[in-house]
Amino acid sequence: MVVALLTVMPVETAHAQELQVKFNVNSKQVEGSDKSVFDNLKETVEQWMNDRQWTELQFQKNERIAVTFNVTVVKYDKATNMFECTALIQANRPVYNSAYTTTLYNNKDDNFNFQFAQFDQLNFDDETLGSQLTAMLAYYAYLILGLDLDSFAPLGGTEVLQRCMNLTNNAQSLDFGGWKAFEDSRNRFAIINDYLDEAMKPFRQLQYDYYRLGLDEMANNAERGRTNISTALETGLKKAHEDKPLSLLPMIWTDYKRDELANIYKGKGTQKEKEAVYNILFGINASQSEAWDKVRN
């Protein structure tokens, strides 16, 4: 992923751009509006995010992080160019030595509100932010890049994640929801603030232990990879939940890892290992008990 890992990939020209973004806009709830503004929004955002260099790192073209924004427009006011939306943001990471991709991040933003006029040019820097739209897009770019880098080296995304935190602090003055400190336990502030909290360091370490030592290893040695994942769930996920029980990050993570975890353990591993994993997952997220039952089978 980062420069040190490029040597294992096929030799080709390195590209600066890190993201491959799809920005899907569902405007069915605002029927009667001119659809061209929604098409232009999609095209403008995708071009801006995909052409921008977010870090100094060099990425191979086939290493760019796939990110999808599924945006639902709830209300649109043409007179003020105001969009009220929800967005489901998902990022995927390739698993090395396999054709499998794994979900790196998946979460809903219920305050994805912004102003955009057709043919607007997007401008941004970390200090002035530019606009609510570019601030949100940059927030998710930095967050996802930080998660990705954490998955390739222990705490490897610290610098990028700090940029995300600084952006969030600067966005406190924006007159839009989702940024305010301690207003909501799963808004944009809460996600990055919790992730960088010292008490959540085990959760950050989990990213490396789960992906690099676990999933990436499974293609070579499934038994060793799964054992490493079991250890990561104990020392990373469980410990983070114990150290900061009010953080929703472990629960959000288990929500989007539900099916993957069930598949990793279903019919595999010792019963003792499976019971230990089940107890961790059920203790954090009992609402997914149906999936956790598969872990024990």
Predicted segments with their positions:
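A cross-kingdom marker for long, charged
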Residues: N24, Y211-N297
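Sec/Tat signal peptide C-region and signal peptidase I cleavage site
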Residues: V11-A16
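Sec-exported extracytoplasmic/periplasmic mature domains
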Residues: E46-W54, G146-D150, A262, K266
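Bacterial N-terminal signal peptides
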Residues: M1-P10
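Second-shell loop/turn segments in exported
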Residues: K28-K35, N123-S131, D243
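Acidic/His-rich structured neighborhood in mature extracellular/periplasmic domains
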Residues: A79-I192
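Start-of-domain marker
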Residues: Q17-E84, V95-N97
